[in-house]
Amino acid sequence: MSSAPAEPGPSLDRNPPQDIDAEKSVLGAMLSSKDAIADVVEEIKGVDFYRPGHELIFNTITDLYGRGDPADTVTTADALDRRGELERAGGRLYLAELLTNVTVTANAAYYAKIVAEKAVLRRLVEASIRIAQMGYQGQGEVADIVDAAQQTLYDVSTRKTSEEYHPLSELFESTFDELEAIEAPRRAPGGRPPS
């Protein structure tokens, strides 16, 4: 008794999950409103964007916003240009075009959730490929492979990425502590630097 050949699975040459219109709307809203920036950064990170240029724009906007600088098309284009990334991000005209995608800046958080969901789906696809590779390679104990596969899926479900993010308050506190530790030996009793 022979079994019928297996049906081919879904093609891996398909485009990964994405919503470019949502990405453009998020960025356009951020370029239009500080409130939109505050809403969006609660939902997504730069790595959540499908288009690399969008990640560059997002990171530049959030850098400007984090420094208390205005983040509009002019300042964002200038910052990207100083970094040598303006053309990779699409250029000045593309930044202006992003503003045309915005109907209501109040919807920015909703669009950001769409971007976040698509990013999770892309990570799930990537994780499934890694899990399939683990299974095909079959290196190590089966229980260890299963554990690694489960951890891979868990990381996707908790939105972990290769970059670990920490709240700014933690970073500032640890940086301040390090600076104090460096400065302490240089200070003479009485709090003044030695002559």
Predicted regions mapped to residue ranges:
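The Walker A/P-loop phosphate-binding site
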Residues: 31, 163-195
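Short, flexible helix-adjacent loops and helix caps
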Residues: 42, 69, 136, 161, ...
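Noncatalytic partner-interaction/assembly domains of nucleic-acid and motor enzyme complexes
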Residues: 1-120
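Alpha-helix boundary/capping detector
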Residues: 52, 83-88, 137-141, 158, ...
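Conserved catalytic-core motifs characterized by acidic clusters
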Residues: 6, 139, 165-168
